[in-house]
Amino acid sequence: MKLFAGNAIPELAQLIANRLYTSLGVAAVNRFSDGEISVQINENVRGGDLFIIQSTCAPTNDNLMELVVMVDALRRASAGRITAVMPYFGYSRQDRRVRSARVPITAKVVADFLSSVGVDRVLTVDLHAEQIQGFFDVPVDNVFGSPILLEDMLQQDFNNPIVVSPDIGGVVRARAIAKLLNDTDMAIIDKRRPRANMSQVMHIIGEVADRDCVLVDDMIDTSSTLCKAAEALKEHGAKRVFAYATHPIFSGQAHANIKNSVIDEVIICDTIPLNSAIKALPNVRTLTLSGMLAEAIRRISNEESISAMFEH
Protein backbone atom coordinates (compact mmCIF):
# COMPACT_ATOMS: atom_id res chain seq x y z
CA MET A 1 0.00 0.00 0.00
CA LYS A 2 1.22 3.50 -0.88
CA LEU A 3 -0.48 6.85 -0.28
CA PHE A 4 -0.14 9.89 -2.50
CA ALA A 5 -1.72 13.33 -2.11
CA GLY A 6 -2.50 16.31 -4.27
CA ASN A 7 -2.56 19.88 -3.01
CA ALA A 8 -6.22 20.01 -1.94
CA ILE A 9 -6.06 18.58 1.61
CA PRO A 10 -2.42 18.08 2.61
CA GLU A 11 -3.13 18.21 6.36
CA LEU A 12 -5.78 15.47 6.24
CA ALA A 13 -3.59 13.38 3.92
CA GLN A 14 -0.71 13.58 6.39
CA LEU A 15 -2.98 12.66 9.31
CA ILE A 16 -4.21 9.61 7.40
CA ALA A 17 -0.63 8.57 6.64
CA ASN A 18 0.27 8.97 10.32
CA ARG A 19 -2.66 6.76 11.33
CA LEU A 20 -1.44 4.07 8.95
CA TYR A 21 2.15 4.37 10.22
CA THR A 22 3.41 5.24 6.77
CA SER A 23 4.56 8.27 4.82
CA LEU A 24 3.09 9.96 1.79
CA GLY A 25 4.52 8.89 -1.55
CA VAL A 26 7.17 11.01 -3.22
CA ALA A 27 5.49 13.01 -5.96
CA ALA A 28 5.92 16.54 -7.29
CA VAL A 29 2.56 18.16 -8.05
CA ASN A 30 3.24 21.66 -9.35
CA ARG A 31 2.30 24.13 -12.07
CA PHE A 32 4.02 25.06 -15.29
CA SER A 33 4.48 28.78 -15.93
CA ASP A 34 1.27 28.87 -17.99
CA GLY A 35 -0.78 27.32 -15.17
CA GLU A 36 -0.93 23.77 -16.51
CA ILE A 37 -0.54 20.99 -13.94
CA SER A 38 2.80 19.21 -13.70
CA VAL A 39 3.04 15.81 -11.98
CA GLN A 40 6.08 13.60 -11.54
CA ILE A 41 6.13 10.41 -9.47
CA ASN A 42 9.56 10.08 -7.89
CA GLU A 43 9.49 6.51 -6.62
CA ASN A 44 8.77 3.03 -7.92
CA VAL A 45 5.04 2.19 -7.92
CA ARG A 46 5.05 -0.79 -10.30
CA GLY A 47 2.34 -3.25 -9.28
CA GLY A 48 1.51 -1.25 -6.16
CA ASP A 49 -1.82 -0.80 -4.38
CA LEU A 50 -2.03 2.99 -4.56
CA PHE A 51 -4.33 5.54 -2.92
CA ILE A 52 -4.54 9.19 -4.03
CA ILE A 53 -6.00 11.47 -1.34
CA GLN A 54 -7.61 14.52 -2.95
CA SER A 55 -10.86 16.37 -2.29
CA THR A 56 -12.29 18.10 -5.34
CA CYS A 57 -13.19 21.22 -3.38
CA ALA A 58 -12.50 24.80 -4.47
CA PRO A 59 -10.68 25.49 -6.69
CA THR A 60 -12.74 22.56 -7.92
CA ASN A 61 -11.46 22.25 -11.47
CA ASP A 62 -7.80 22.59 -10.48
CA ASN A 63 -8.13 19.93 -7.80
CA LEU A 64 -10.03 17.61 -10.12
CA MET A 65 -7.38 17.97 -12.82
CA GLU A 66 -4.62 17.34 -10.27
CA LEU A 67 -6.35 14.11 -9.34
CA VAL A 68 -6.83 12.79 -12.87
CA VAL A 69 -3.31 13.78 -13.95
CA MET A 70 -1.89 11.97 -10.91
CA VAL A 71 -3.97 8.92 -11.79
CA ASP A 72 -2.61 8.97 -15.34
CA ALA A 73 0.96 9.35 -14.11
CA LEU A 74 0.59 6.39 -11.75
CA ARG A 75 -1.20 4.28 -14.35
CA ARG A 76 1.60 4.89 -16.88
CA ALA A 77 4.08 3.92 -14.16
CA SER A 78 2.43 0.47 -14.07
CA ALA A 79 0.41 0.84 -10.86
CA GLY A 80 -1.38 -2.34 -9.85
CA ARG A 81 -4.54 -0.71 -8.47
CA ILE A 82 -5.48 2.95 -7.99
CA THR A 83 -8.08 4.13 -5.49
CA ALA A 84 -9.16 7.77 -5.56
CA VAL A 85 -9.78 8.83 -1.96
CA MET A 86 -12.08 11.84 -2.33
CA PRO A 87 -13.28 12.96 1.12
CA TYR A 88 -15.34 15.64 -0.63
CA PHE A 89 -16.70 14.83 -4.10
CA GLY A 90 -17.11 18.08 -6.04
CA TYR A 91 -20.02 18.54 -8.46
CA SER A 92 -22.10 16.09 -6.40
CA ARG A 93 -25.03 18.52 -6.25
CA GLN A 94 -25.36 18.46 -10.03
CA ASP A 95 -26.76 14.94 -10.06
CA ARG A 96 -30.03 15.29 -12.01
CA ARG A 97 -31.98 17.35 -14.53
CA VAL A 98 -34.73 19.03 -12.56
CA ARG A 99 -37.93 19.21 -14.61
CA SER A 100 -35.93 18.16 -17.70
CA ALA A 101 -34.08 21.50 -17.77
CA ARG A 102 -31.36 21.88 -20.40
CA VAL A 103 -28.53 21.36 -17.92
CA PRO A 104 -25.75 18.78 -17.59
CA ILE A 105 -25.55 16.01 -15.02
CA THR A 106 -22.04 17.03 -14.08
CA ALA A 107 -21.64 14.41 -11.36
CA LYS A 108 -21.92 11.78 -14.13
CA VAL A 109 -19.38 13.66 -16.26
CA VAL A 110 -16.88 13.60 -13.38
CA ALA A 111 -17.56 9.90 -12.74
CA ASP A 112 -16.90 9.09 -16.40
CA PHE A 113 -13.76 11.24 -16.35
CA LEU A 114 -12.31 9.40 -13.37
CA SER A 115 -13.15 6.00 -14.82
CA SER A 116 -11.65 6.87 -18.20
CA VAL A 117 -8.21 7.80 -16.82
CA GLY A 118 -7.84 4.53 -14.95
CA VAL A 119 -9.29 4.84 -11.44
CA ASP A 120 -10.09 1.34 -10.16
CA ARG A 121 -12.07 2.34 -7.07
CA VAL A 122 -13.38 5.47 -5.35
CA LEU A 123 -13.57 6.11 -1.61
CA THR A 124 -15.63 9.15 -0.61
CA VAL A 125 -17.53 10.55 2.37
CA ASP A 126 -21.21 11.45 2.59
CA LEU A 127 -22.08 11.81 -1.08
CA HIS A 128 -24.75 14.48 -1.46
CA ALA A 129 -26.84 11.91 -3.33
CA GLU A 130 -26.01 8.24 -2.79
CA GLN A 131 -27.23 7.31 -6.26
CA ILE A 132 -24.11 8.99 -7.66
CA GLN A 133 -22.39 5.68 -6.90
CA GLY A 134 -24.33 4.30 -9.86
CA PHE A 135 -22.76 6.86 -12.20
CA PHE A 136 -19.43 5.02 -11.95
CA ASP A 137 -18.31 1.94 -13.83
CA VAL A 138 -15.98 1.10 -10.92
CA PRO A 139 -16.76 0.27 -7.27
CA VAL A 140 -17.51 3.22 -4.98
CA ASP A 141 -17.28 3.10 -1.19
CA ASN A 142 -19.35 5.91 0.31
CA VAL A 143 -18.51 6.07 4.02
CA PHE A 144 -20.29 8.23 6.56
CA GLY A 145 -19.13 11.05 8.78
CA SER A 146 -22.06 10.56 11.16
CA PRO A 147 -20.19 8.25 13.61
CA ILE A 148 -17.57 10.96 14.15
CA LEU A 149 -20.24 13.63 14.57
CA LEU A 150 -22.27 11.39 16.87
CA GLU A 151 -19.27 10.65 19.07
CA ASP A 152 -18.86 14.39 19.62
CA MET A 153 -22.58 14.87 20.30
CA LEU A 154 -22.53 12.20 22.99
CA GLN A 155 -19.75 14.07 24.77
CA GLN A 156 -21.71 17.33 24.91
CA ASP A 157 -23.80 18.45 27.85
CA PHE A 158 -26.98 19.05 25.88
CA ASN A 159 -30.06 20.19 27.79
CA ASN A 160 -33.14 18.25 26.62
CA PRO A 161 -31.79 17.94 23.05
CA ILE A 162 -33.78 17.59 19.85
CA VAL A 163 -32.27 16.70 16.48
CA VAL A 164 -33.33 19.03 13.67
CA SER A 165 -33.27 18.37 9.93
CA PRO A 166 -32.77 21.64 8.01
CA ASP A 167 -34.97 20.38 5.17
CA ILE A 168 -37.19 17.49 4.10
CA GLY A 169 -34.32 15.85 2.20
CA GLY A 170 -32.28 15.43 5.37
CA VAL A 171 -34.95 13.59 7.37
CA VAL A 172 -33.38 10.14 6.99
CA ARG A 173 -30.01 11.44 8.20
CA ALA A 174 -31.58 13.30 11.14
CA ARG A 175 -33.72 10.32 12.13
CA ALA A 176 -30.67 8.05 12.20
CA ILE A 177 -28.75 10.52 14.38
CA ALA A 178 -31.74 11.00 16.70
CA LYS A 179 -32.07 7.25 17.21
CA LEU A 180 -28.40 6.88 18.11
CA LEU A 181 -28.45 10.02 20.28
CA ASN A 182 -30.33 8.23 23.03
CA ASP A 183 -33.44 8.00 20.83
CA THR A 184 -34.14 11.72 21.15
CA ASP A 185 -36.95 13.62 19.43
CA MET A 186 -36.69 15.10 15.94
CA ALA A 187 -37.90 18.28 14.26
CA ILE A 188 -37.96 19.35 10.61
CA ILE A 189 -37.58 22.81 9.10
CA ASP A 190 -39.75 23.39 6.04
CA LYS A 191 -38.13 25.92 3.74
CA ARG A 192 -38.54 27.36 0.28
CA ARG A 193 -35.54 28.10 -1.95
CA PRO A 194 -36.30 30.98 -4.38
CA ARG A 195 -32.98 30.53 -6.25
CA ALA A 196 -29.62 28.79 -5.93
CA ASN A 197 -27.75 29.44 -2.66
CA MET A 198 -30.74 31.33 -1.24
CA SER A 199 -33.29 29.84 1.13
CA GLN A 200 -36.20 31.09 3.21
CA VAL A 201 -37.30 29.28 6.34
CA MET A 202 -41.06 28.72 6.38
CA HIS A 203 -42.02 26.85 9.54
CA ILE A 204 -40.86 24.24 12.03
CA ILE A 205 -42.43 20.81 12.40
CA GLY A 206 -41.80 19.73 15.98
CA GLU A 207 -41.54 21.27 19.44
CA VAL A 208 -38.21 23.02 20.06
CA ALA A 209 -39.07 25.42 22.89
CA ASP A 210 -36.70 25.30 25.89
CA ARG A 211 -34.51 22.69 24.19
CA ASP A 212 -31.01 22.47 22.75
CA CYS A 213 -31.37 22.02 19.00
CA VAL A 214 -28.87 19.88 17.09
CA LEU A 215 -28.99 20.69 13.38
CA VAL A 216 -27.46 17.98 11.16
CA ASP A 217 -26.63 18.21 7.46
CA ASP A 218 -24.15 16.77 4.98
CA MET A 219 -22.63 20.12 4.00
CA ILE A 220 -22.60 23.84 4.73
CA ASP A 221 -22.17 26.09 1.70
CA THR A 222 -22.92 29.81 2.10
CA SER A 223 -24.52 28.95 5.47
CA SER A 224 -27.54 31.09 4.58
CA THR A 225 -29.87 28.13 5.13
CA LEU A 226 -28.17 27.21 8.38
CA CYS A 227 -28.26 30.71 9.85
CA LYS A 228 -31.90 31.29 8.95
CA ALA A 229 -32.76 27.90 10.41
CA ALA A 230 -31.02 28.87 13.65
CA GLU A 231 -32.94 32.16 13.76
CA ALA A 232 -36.23 30.33 13.29
CA LEU A 233 -35.36 27.87 16.05
CA LYS A 234 -34.44 30.66 18.47
CA GLU A 235 -37.65 32.51 17.57
CA HIS A 236 -39.56 29.36 18.51
CA GLY A 237 -37.91 29.27 21.92
CA ALA A 238 -34.84 27.08 21.41
CA LYS A 239 -32.25 27.52 24.16
CA ARG A 240 -29.14 26.79 22.11
CA VAL A 241 -28.45 25.78 18.52
CA PHE A 242 -25.59 23.49 17.49
CA ALA A 243 -24.93 22.76 13.81
CA TYR A 244 -23.15 19.57 12.71
CA ALA A 245 -22.10 18.90 9.11
CA THR A 246 -19.53 16.77 7.32
CA HIS A 247 -18.40 19.09 4.52
CA PRO A 248 -17.43 22.73 5.30
CA ILE A 249 -17.68 24.32 1.85
CA PHE A 250 -18.09 27.83 3.32
CA SER A 251 -18.36 29.75 0.06
CA GLY A 252 -19.56 33.30 -0.60
CA GLN A 253 -20.72 35.13 2.52
CA ALA A 254 -20.34 32.12 4.80
CA HIS A 255 -17.89 33.84 7.13
CA ALA A 256 -20.07 36.91 7.66
CA ASN A 257 -23.21 34.79 7.95
CA ILE A 258 -21.79 32.57 10.67
CA LYS A 259 -20.06 35.44 12.48
CA ASN A 260 -23.34 37.36 12.73
CA SER A 261 -25.59 34.36 13.36
CA VAL A 262 -27.29 33.15 16.54
CA ILE A 263 -25.70 29.70 16.20
CA ASP A 264 -23.92 28.71 19.39
CA GLU A 265 -21.47 26.35 17.69
CA VAL A 266 -20.75 24.94 14.23
CA ILE A 267 -19.01 21.55 14.23
CA ILE A 268 -17.64 20.29 10.93
CA CYS A 269 -15.16 17.71 9.58
CA ASP A 270 -11.86 18.20 7.78
CA THR A 271 -12.87 17.02 4.31
CA ILE A 272 -12.21 20.57 3.04
CA PRO A 273 -9.52 22.92 4.40
CA LEU A 274 -10.76 26.07 6.14
CA ASN A 275 -9.48 29.54 5.32
CA SER A 276 -7.92 31.62 8.08
CA ALA A 277 -11.02 33.78 8.57
CA ILE A 278 -13.27 30.79 9.20
CA LYS A 279 -10.65 29.19 11.46
CA ALA A 280 -10.60 32.34 13.58
CA LEU A 281 -14.33 32.21 14.34
CA PRO A 282 -14.76 31.21 18.00
CA ASN A 283 -17.92 29.20 17.33
CA VAL A 284 -16.46 26.93 14.61
CA ARG A 285 -14.81 23.64 15.59
CA THR A 286 -13.31 20.90 13.40
CA LEU A 287 -13.35 17.13 13.88
CA THR A 288 -10.98 14.91 11.93
CA LEU A 289 -12.03 11.98 9.76
CA SER A 290 -8.44 10.76 9.47
CA GLY A 291 -8.97 7.72 11.69
CA MET A 292 -12.08 6.58 9.84
CA LEU A 293 -10.54 7.12 6.40
CA ALA A 294 -7.33 5.37 7.44
CA GLU A 295 -9.34 2.36 8.57
CA ALA A 296 -11.32 2.36 5.30
CA ILE A 297 -8.09 2.48 3.29
CA ARG A 298 -6.63 -0.36 5.35
CA ARG A 299 -9.73 -2.46 4.76
CA ILE A 300 -9.73 -1.80 1.02
CA SER A 301 -6.07 -2.73 0.77
CA ASN A 302 -6.65 -5.94 2.75
CA GLU A 303 -9.88 -6.82 0.89
CA GLU A 304 -11.95 -6.48 4.07
CA SER A 305 -15.53 -5.27 4.47
CA ILE A 306 -16.19 -1.52 4.53
CA SER A 307 -19.84 -1.85 5.53
CA ALA A 308 -18.77 -3.66 8.70
CA MET A 309 -17.35 -0.35 9.92
CA PHE A 310 -20.87 1.01 10.30
CA GLU A 311 -22.68 -1.96 11.82
CA HIS A 312 -24.15 -1.00 15.19
Curated annotation (Swiss-Prot):
Required cofactor names: Mg(2+)
Cofactor note: Binds 2 Mg(2+) ions per subunit.
Binding locations of Mg(2+) 1: H128
Catalytic activity: D-ribose 5-phosphate + ATP = 5-phospho-alpha-D-ribose 1-diphosphate + AMP + H(+)
GO MF term list: ATP binding; kinase activity; magnesium ion binding; ribose phosphate diphosphokinase activity
GO cellular component terms given for this protein: cytoplasm; ribose phosphate diphosphokinase complex
Coiled-coil positions: none
InterPro entries in alphabetical order: PRib_PP_synth_CS (IPR000842), Pribosyltran_N (IPR029099), PRibTrfase_dom (IPR000836), PRTase-like (IPR029057), Rib-P_diPkinase (IPR005946), Rib-P_diPkinase_bac (IPR037515)
Family note: Belongs to the ribose-phosphate pyrophosphokinase family. Class I subfamily.
Protein name (database record): Ribose-phosphate pyrophosphokinase
Native species: Baumannia cicadellinicola subsp. Homalodisca coagulata
